[in-house]
Amino acid sequence: MQDDGKVILRFRDGHTERATLAVIDAAREVLDATPDQDGGSEEVPFSALKAVFFPRMVPVEQLEEPHGSLIAVEFADGEVIRGTATYNPEASGFFLFPLDRSKNERIFVVRDAIASIEVEKL
């Protein structure tokens, strides 16, 4: 997948920040990012995050075909996003490829920000 590291961080308290992502460290449950407005790199704990949105940078036709199950993710704040993912409940997060990829190519969902997950029938 092509990307330039530009992401949108969505926090559990409701605010969002545009940033450049350096790395998602699932083992330590943190990510390293540089907020667009600050310019300084910071470590963001998963406990503060809801999800990380990766804006679409290429035409939809050029996006990689997602693999996994069709699921509906409901966050603690009531937002529901449907998409394709390979979900492992043991992992601290997972990538969700939204059904509507016109804005976001993929979303990193933080497991502890989820209220429920439903596997949808085809």
Predicted regions and their residues:
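Conserved RNA-binding domains used in RNP assembly and mRNA/RNA metabolism
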Residues: 1-122
